[in-house]
């Protein structure tokens, strides 16, 4: 099972250093199934027993792109895993860069956690699967370092997870399109994680607020 934590705009380098130290000690040995996406200002240079990923990047090595992070910056911290397509990035106008980001990350051999998800209107109109398929049309579903995270927008940060029957329907559909690992994200917490992980085709979870405290994240990992 893959356990990924998206810390979003939380933690400083000082606090994430403590977070990483505790997680490293708990893990004991390197585990590629544990991924943490800290804010870029908190990236750590030291070796960790988990994969440190980037929440965002610009599809370039470097250049005249004010305020952006290029491959050169990720390389400095040994980062080879990126999050692409999160709905909070799409809402900020990231939609047009998604294909460019995916193609760049694939070209350079990054592990990619690619997020997809529908809003409540799309769900209620019965067009979820059609919508998700369209989101996936721009990427290579056979890329060997791809992970797909299904995060229904109506569940992100709301405290209300999607129903397990809905999750199962979506993951079964996605499994018919690709053989890569499939994650669920959207208000994952200690009360629902066991049920979510028991859904057929679920290969793990992408956790938000419930992973902000390392002790909580560890508890979710250990089950």
From Swiss-Prot:
Subcellular localization(s) per the UniProt record: Cytoplasm
InterPro entries according to UniProt: Aldolase_TIM, TIM_sf, TrioseP_Isoase_bac/euk, Triosephosphate_isomerase, Triosephosphate_isomerase_AS
Keyword Cytoplasm belongs to the record: yes
Pfam families, alphabetized: TIM
PROSITE patterns documented for this protein: TIM_1 (PS00171), TIM_2 (PS51440)
GO CC aspect terms: cytosol
Alphabetized CDD domains for the sequence: TIM
Keywords carried by this UniProt record: Cytoplasm, Gluconeogenesis, Glycolysis, Isomerase
Any one Gene Ontology BP term: gluconeogenesis
Coiled coil start-end: none
Tagged with keyword Cytoplasm: yes
Catalytic residues of the enzyme: 86 (electrophile), 151 (proton acceptor)
Main localization category: cytoplasm
Enzyme Commission number: 5.3.1.1
Annotated catalysed reactions: D-glyceraldehyde 3-phosphate = dihydroxyacetone phosphate
Pathway: Carbohydrate biosynthesis; gluconeogenesis; Carbohydrate degradation; glycolysis; D-glyceraldehyde 3-phosphate from glycerone phosphate: step 1/1
Binding site for substrate: 6-8, 157, 187
Subunit structure: Homodimer.
Functional note: Involved in the gluconeogenesis. Catalyzes stereospecifically the conversion of dihydroxyacetone phosphate (DHAP) to D-glyceraldehyde-3-phosphate (G3P).
Family: Belongs to the triosephosphate isomerase family.
Stored NCBIfam families: PRK00042.3-2
Protein name, per record: Triosephosphate isomerase
């Amino acid at each position: 099972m893959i356990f990924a934590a998206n810390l979003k705009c939380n933690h400083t380098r000082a606090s994430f250093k403590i977070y990483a130290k505790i997680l490293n000690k708990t893990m004991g040995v390197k585990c590629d199934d544990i991924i943490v996406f800290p804010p870029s200002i908190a990236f750590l240079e030291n070796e960790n027993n988990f994969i440190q990923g980037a929440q965002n990047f610009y599809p370039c090595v470097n250049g005249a792109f004010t305020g952006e992070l290029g491959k050169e910056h990720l390389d400095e911290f040994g980062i080879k895993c990126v999050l692409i397509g999160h709905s909070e990035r799409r809402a900020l106008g990231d939609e047009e860069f998604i294909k460019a980001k995916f193609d760049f990350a694939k070209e350079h051999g990054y592990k990619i956690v690619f997020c997809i998800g529908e809003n409540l209107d799309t769900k209620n109109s019965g067009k979820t699967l059609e919508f998700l398929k369209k989101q996936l049309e721009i990427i290579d579903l056979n890329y060997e370092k791809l992970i797909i995270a299904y995060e229904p927008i109506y569940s992100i940060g709301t405290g209300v997870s999607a129903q397990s029957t809905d999750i199962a329907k979506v993951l079964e559909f996605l499994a018919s399109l690709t053989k890569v690992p499939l994650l669920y994200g959207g208000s994952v917490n200690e009360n629902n994680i066991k049920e979510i992980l028991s859904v057929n085709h679920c290969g793990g979870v992408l956790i938000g607020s419930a992973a902000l405290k390392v002790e909580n994240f560890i508890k979710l990992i250990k089950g």
